[in-house]
Amino acid sequence: MNFKKLPKIELHCHLDGSLRVDTILDIAKKDNIHLPSYNKKELINYVSIMDDCNSLDEYLNKFFIPNKVMQTKENLKRIAFELLEDVAADNVKYIEVRFAPLLHVEKGLNIEEIIESVLEGIKEAEKLYDIKGNLILGCMRNMDIPSAFEVVKKGAKFIGKGVVAIDLCAGEEPHFPGKYIEVLKLAKECGYRITIHAGEAGVGENVLEAINLLNAERIGHGIYIKDCAEAYKLVKEKNIPLEVCPTSNLHTKAFESYETHPFMDFLKDGIKVTINTDNMTVSNTTITKELEMLNKFCGLSIGDYKILYLNAVEASFASSETKEVLKSYVKEITA
């Protein structure tokens, strides 16, 4: 089965986890940024999981170097453009890129300038390629609550101009949703759609709380609902889409193998699953690679993929017009 040729949708892709290594090197040399190595083969080890990784926290360490080169308008625009260029080459028709604006203020940019630069890169790529992109703003859970309010407030002016949603990301602690009730209440009032990283690192109850306390419309990862019957039931009853990222889940040691990943069980039970990369560079993956692995180890069929694709169309925060265009590609999903 040729997954490369199939139309695809990406709903969970972090900008700072998906840079070209060549671009990191190029910007570092141009802007005189120190890197541990200027040899591409060596640098890959610092920004990608090559052999082993023991936890989500260790996985997140791979973002330090990419963020060093994402501190100017020019660089942010370029990196956003290149991401859409890369996924368009993988036949991705629609992507929701997510990033945390406050990770890019080190050289004096303000939140509005940061968001605007990324949107410019997305829009430039849309003009050249058969792809549509939107932006999800991330609030870092390792920053204070006022920081989250700042992102929500300052990003609101871009809703309807490319920004579609708000997210909570970074390391996951039990019962984190309770801290962010007021932040997400404001986000909803501003008009943001809501997706929350939860149930990625062993705490299924966080999914329950993200839906009940934060009005999450989608869940990033959500795989640990398998250990929380109440969360599983709620996700199924409310038809809450899960943004599943299989290779990333293996890297963070959520699961030992593709065969033991619960993705196929979820799909067969009617959970609205979508398949995503999470971080193309950190996990050294593409949507095509994800599908190939699921086909090889889990028996993913063309019929299964059609369900996944339509799940992603429905789960997306795209406009109704864009969704209709995306649905039209279903006829291309053949073995």
From Swiss-Prot:
* GO CC entries: cytosol
**Keyword vocabulary terms for this entry:** Hydrolase, Metal-binding, Nucleotide metabolism, Zinc
Reaction equation(s) it catalyzes: adenosine + H2O + H(+) = inosine + NH4(+); 2'-deoxyadenosine + H2O + H(+) = 2'-deoxyinosine + NH4(+)
Site feature: Important for catalytic activity = 221
Sites binding substrate sit at: 14, 16
Looking up InterPro entries in the UniProt record yields: A_deaminase, A_deaminase_dom, Ado/ade_deaminase, Metal_Hydrolase
Q: Which residues bind Zn(2+)?
A: 12, 14, 197, 278
**Active site: residue positions:** 200 (proton donor)
What is one Pfam family matched by this protein?
A_deaminase
Q: Which domain of life is it from?
A: Bacteria
Q: Indicate the enzyme's highest-level EC class.
A: hydrolase
Cofactor(s) for this protein?
Zn(2+)
On cofactor binding, the record's note says: Binds 1 zinc ion per subunit.
Known EC number: 3.5.4.4
Q: What biological processes does GO assign it?
A: adenosine catabolic process; hypoxanthine salvage; inosine biosynthetic process; nucleotide metabolic process; purine ribonucleoside monophosphate biosynthetic process
Question: Which terms in the Gene Ontology molecular function aspect does this entry carry?
Answer: 2'-deoxyadenosine deaminase activity; adenosine deaminase activity; zinc ion binding
Q: Which NCBIfam families match?
A: aden_deam
Family per similarity comment: Belongs to the metallo-dependent hydrolases superfamily. Adenosine and AMP deaminases family. Adenosine deaminase subfamily.
> So what does this one do?
Catalyzes the hydrolytic deamination of adenosine and 2-deoxyadenosine.
Tell me which PANTHER family the record gives: ADENOSINE DEAMINASE
Q: What is this protein called?
A: Adenosine deaminase
Species assigned in the record: Clostridium botulinum (strain Loch Maree / Type A3)
